[in-house]
UniProtKB/Swiss-Prot annotation:
Assembly mode: Component of the NDC80 complex, which is composed of at least NDC80/HEC1 and CDCA1. Interacts with CENPH.
Database matches in InterPro entries: DUF5595, Kinetochore_Ndc80, Ndc80_CH, Ndc80_sf
Top-rank taxon, per record: Eukaryota
GO molecular function list: cyclin binding; identical protein binding; kinetochore adaptor activity; microtubule binding
Lineage of origin: Eukaryota, Metazoa, Chordata, Craniata, Vertebrata
Bias kind Low complexity: ranges: 1-16
Record protein name field: Kinetochore protein NDC80 homolog
Function field: Acts as a component of the essential kinetochore-associated NDC80 complex, which is required for chromosome segregation and spindle checkpoint activity. Required for kinetochore integrity and the organization of stable microtubule binding sites in the outer plate of the kinetochore. The NDC80 complex synergistically enhances the affinity of the SKA1 complex for microtubules and may allow the NDC80 complex to track depolymerizing microtubules. May play a role in chromosome congression and may be essential for the end-on attachment of the kinetochores to spindle microtubules.
Location relative to the cell: Nucleus; Chromosome, Centromere, Kinetochore
Stretches for region Disordered: 1-47
Length: 640
């Protein structure tokens, strides 16, 4: 059984918490046994999460994994302080894993509607409501989602269940949006984890009793037992009371752990030395990785070169084996000839012995001796001549073998180049894209004689010429299509230029009308100012008349009223004319703006459509490639 990696850590660390929150909301402190739909916290029971265990979120946040580790409080997280979501919601791999996990859960639990991973990439609001109702039905079978205000009901349900992160109302309207769906799918995964924990509690309630001694280990190596849980509870109680040091609790749990695991004090020093050595090894490897960031790439290139060398040497060994077989056959025939020659030599020796015996037992005359010497000289000359001819033949045979080896190597090089080009053009093997069921591969067998490659002329040339003709036809069609698209592009460019000139003219007219509007507005303001000045003069005149002459008061008052009525009429007329002119200008500007926007939108759509067609055509434009392929086909066909 593994021990926690940080049990023997520093016991004098200071708390990293900046605030001890006294939360009045007791929702986060409820245990799973409180009620059927109790708070399930953030426990992730799924075993299909990623290999990085740091992404898992435990029931009460991350546990302290030792006496000296940091203990961050997650209690009171439903207060006013906003909790940062530790899950990698911007990681596409994590979101895809959550979608896959949700799809598997729905399929395994008999979801009535058809659902796939593709359909869960961006679901609609109706699909989300159905999925939420289906999952929440396991926790509360009698629950029915109201027809209206679901955008308030669903976040409220999550909040009641203890979901630590807020869900906005606006996110309920845009469930499938790229910026909203990761938060929603993570919340659904949390809800499925709640159901899994709830199901586990119902099936085996004894596993959650306080008196249960757990003997297993988690993924991070913490042993589940009563000793560890008591230590965590005491530390947290001490922390909530204001304590920041835990020397006594650490010493107590260390002594209990030593008794529990039978720790040998002498082995601790050895383990510390081993730990130091491993840390030094890790630092050395990190330095090597920093000094050689591309070492893996260079090693891969070196491995590729070694693999290429191995293939070359294997081919060379195969050639050597075939050459060795040929030499063995030749050596066998030479040995047979040597044996035959030895037998002939033995027979000649016996004949010479017999003749020598006859020669020793008979007497020769001078003429016989001269004749024999003459015949011997002639035979010696014949032997010398045959020896020279044999040496010449052997030299010629050696030259022919060298010439044969060079020709064979040249043929194999050409065949390798041919096979490489054929693979690049997808002509071999038979199942290749461009082979069309024909076998374009050439097998060179020099033992079959000088005509071993003749059969490939009829086997390859006809289908190859057929492919060449088809390629030429495709090139011709592509050229025609390119010309037609270029004509279309020129026409569209001409239309665009014409529309741009029209837009420019309309903009100039709009500017002129705008200037006219401002001019009219300025004239109206000047007229209004003039009337105001006249009114001021009349007021002054009125005051003079009132102070100087009492007799003509009624007459002056009537005159003043007449002038005021005239001023009101003038003001109403001026205001009405200004309003009409402004309305006319506004309507005209709106019409011009709408027309300009529609024309610009149409031009933008046409430009984007033309750009897409042009990019598609340019991406399919293989004229140069097909021309090169055609030339290579012709060269290979002529060489064959």
């Amino acid at each position: 059984m593994r021990r926690s990696s940080t049990t023997s850590g520093s016991s004098g660390r200071q708390s990293t918490m900046v605030l001890r929150v006294q939360d009045s909301n007791k929702m986060g402190l409820q245990t799973p046994q409180t009620k059927d739909r109790g708070t399930f916290g953030k426990l992730s029971m799924s075993k299909t999460t990623s290999a990085t265990s740091e992404r898992k979120v435990s029931f009460f946040g991350k546990r302290a994994s030792g006496a000296g580790g940091s203990r961050n409080s997650q209690y009171g997280m439903f207060g006013t302080e906003k909790i940062k979501d530790p899950r990698p919601l911007h990681d596409k791999a994590f979101i895809q894993q959550c979608i896959k996990q949700l799809c598997e859960f729905l399929v395994e639990n008999g979801y009535a509607h058809n659902v796939t991973i593709k359909s869960l990439q961006s679901p609609s609001v109706k699909d989300f409501i159905k999925i939420f109702t289906f999952i929440y039905g396991f926790l509360c079978p009698s629950y029915e989602l109201p027809d209206s205000k679901f955008e308030e009901e669903i976040p409220r349900v999550f909040k009641e269940l203890g979901y630590p992160f807020p869900l906005s109302k606006s996110s309920m309207y845009t469930v499938g949006a790229p910026h909203t769906w990761p938060q929603i799918v993570a919340a659904l995964i949390w809800l499925t984890d709640c159901f899994k924990l709830y199901a586990a509690m119902r099936e085996n309630p004894s596993s959650f009793d306080d008196g249960q001694n757990w003997g297993g280990e988690t993924d991070d190596g913490i042993v589940h037992n009563k000793l560890f849980m008591d230590y965590v509870v005491k530390c947290y109680e001490h922390f909530m009371k204001g304590g920041d040091t835990y020397e006594e609790l650490d010493a107590e749990v260390q002594s209990k752990l030593k008794d529990l695991f039978n720790v040998d004090e002498f082995k601790i020093e050895g383990l510390a030395a081993e730990n130091k050595r491993l840390h030094e090894e890790i630092a050395r490897l990190e330095k090597e990785r920093e000094s050689e960031p591309d070492r893996l790439v260079s090693l891969r290139k070196l491995r590729s070169s070694f693999q290429a060398d191995v293939q070359k040497y294997q081919a060379y060994l195969a050639n050597l084996e075939s050459h060795t077989t040929i030499l063995d056959q030749k050596m066998k025939s030479v040995n047979e000839e040597v044996e035959t020659t030895e037998m002939e030599v033995e027979a000649m020796k016996q004949e010479n012995a017999r003749l020598q015996h006859i020669f020793d037992n008979q007497k020769y005359s001078v003429a016989d001796i001269e004749r024999i010497n003459h015949e011997r000289n002639e035979l010696q000359q014949t032997i010398n001549k045959l020896t020279k001819e044999l040496e010449a033949e052997e030299h010629q045979l050696w030259n022919e073998e060298l010439k044969y080896a060079r020709n064979k190597e040249a043929i194999e090089t050409q065949l390798a180049e041919y096979h490489k080009l054929a693979r690049k053009l997808k002509l071999i093997p038979i199942s290749a894209e461009n082979s069309k069921g024909h076998d374009f591969e050439i097998h060179f067998n020099p033992e079959a004689g000088p005509n071993c490659l003749v059969k490939y002329r009829t086997q390859i040339k006809a289908p190859l010429m057929e492919i060449v003709n088809q390629t030429e036809e495709e090139i011709r069609k592509a050229t025609q299509r390119k010309m037609s698209l270029e004509d279309t592009l020129e026409q569209v460019n001409a239309m665009v230029a014409e529309k741009k000139s029209s837009v420019k003219t309309l903009k100039e007219e709009a500017e002129k009308l705008d200037d006219l509007y401002h001019q009219k507005l300025k004239e109206a303001e000047e007229e209004e100012q003039k009337c105001a000045n006249e009114l001021e003069l009349l007021e002054k005149h009125k005051q003079l008349l009132e102070s100087g002459v009492n007799e003509g008061l009624s007459e002056a008052t009537n005159e003043l009223h007449d002038i005021q009525r005239q001023y009101q009429i003038v003001m109403q007329t001026t205001t009405e004319e200004s309003r009409k002119a402004g309305d006319n200008l506004n309507r005209l500007l709106e019409v011009i703006t709408t027309h300009v926007v529609s024309i610009e939108k149409y031009l933008d759509e046409q430009n984007s459509k033309i750009d897409r067609d042009y990019e598609e055509f340019m991406s399919e434009d293989l004229l140069s490639t097909l021309t090169g392929i055609l030339d290579s086909y012709k060269k290979k066909a002529e060489s064959i």
